[in-house]
Amino acid sequence: MINALRGMKDLLDSDGKLYKFIVETCEQITKNYGYELCETPKMEETSLFKRSVGESSDIVGKEMYQFIDKGGNDVCLRPEGTAGVVRAFIEAKFDKAGGVKRYYYYGSMFRYERPQRGRLREFHQFGVECFGEASVYEDASVILMLNEILDKFGIETTLKINSLGDSECMPKYRQKLISFIDEKKDQLCEDCRRRLVTNPIRVLDCKKEHCQILLKNAPLITENLNEECYSEFEQLKDILTKNGVKFEVDGRLVRGLDYYCKTAFEFVSDEIGSKSAVAGGGRYDRLVDFLGGKSTPAVGWAMGIERIMEILKQKDMPNSRDGIYICALDKKYIDEIYKIGFKLRKNYKVEISYEAKSPNKHLNLADKKFAKLFLCMGEDEAKNGEIWYKNLENKNEKRIKILNLEGEL
């Protein structure tokens, strides 16, 4: 028997419905903020992620599904969504056109890491990217949008925000951090020692308790911001407060990817483990230029769909009823109900039963399929040109003339 690969799962039945519900909810809200769909390939040149995510990152160093294809091209399955959207933005020459472009995306990402709760080797993300808007109001807007989505799902979260500064204040802070860590570096984990050489600020991203204790009194980037970055961060906090969004300033919050600057944020929840991240993002004004495009400010976020699914499953959310179940009590009426069902499918989701069963058995099947409406034909209904109708939500039932059926529904 052939099974799905480790860390990869099928989306069937209730999982498929939940995935669809999450994506459609996100789409509805992001469209209200002016975002349009951007679909990019699941496979890209490996160099795209080496340049965007950074060769020093764990993603590039350890986790990518990378291979040489039959044409000799170095390719990989995408480990995250932002780089592909940026590549598409540049390839379409939108970076030179000016103006603001807003996109949302969703789909599979791939990382070879240890499978665990809410973390798979093939996982799904929903994300947004805004290009061409440098205002801190846009930073606030993407945070407010994500907060609205998580509220819609009924998930209790804590918003953490930080500023990573810009190309002026970051080098000074990096040197202060290196000086602080230098005498402790031999006590750090192997990953932190590697990061200290390649990208020191990511040492703060370490989740190991031993390293967190050693770095407890490390200098904070928020204490080393220049006037512009400090002013924008204060303005961001003010906008969020005025719009009723609570937050915590976390000076140690650094996004796991190397291209962020200024605003960084993360929504964490205890509903999937102690303060586990369910979504996060920030500003990355340097990435378009870094990937060969015209310098363009950009901000966005990504949300782990599996993590949202895990939380919503715990809430035992009721399945919403949808569609019509149509059936017959005798085989000789199946042709007639098939004809009716086929016609109804032009406007409705319709499940046609090809078997003759008792009314109770049909009702049980309709209930299991979460049908909203139940239509059934027996001898009396057939004689009178009618069909028995029952609404499985409000339990109303009646006989309806077949000629009037669509109008009655």
Curated annotation (Swiss-Prot):
Top-tier EC class: ligase
Keywords per UniProt: Aminoacyl-tRNA synthetase, ATP-binding, Cytoplasm, Ligase, Nucleotide-binding, Protein biosynthesis
Entry keyword annotation includes Protein biosynthesis: yes
UniProt EC number: 6.1.1.21
One Pfam entry name: tRNA-synt_His
Disulfide bridge map: none
GO MF, one annotated term: histidine-tRNA ligase activity
InterPro entries from the UniProt entry: aa-tRNA-synth_II (IPR006195), aa-tRNA-synth_II/BPL/LPL (IPR045864), Anticodon-bd (IPR004154), Anticodon-bd_dom_sf (IPR036621), His-tRNA-ligase (IPR015807), HisRS-like_core (IPR041715), HisRS/HisZ (IPR004516)
Annotated Gene Ontology cellular component terms: cytoplasm
Entry keyword annotation includes Ligase: yes
Signal sequence residues: none
Compartment annotation: Cytoplasm
Domain of life where this protein originates: Bacteria
Subunit details: Homodimer.
Matches recorded under NCBIfam families: hisS
Protein name in the entry: Histidine--tRNA ligase
Taxonomic source organism: Campylobacter fetus subsp. fetus (strain 82-40)
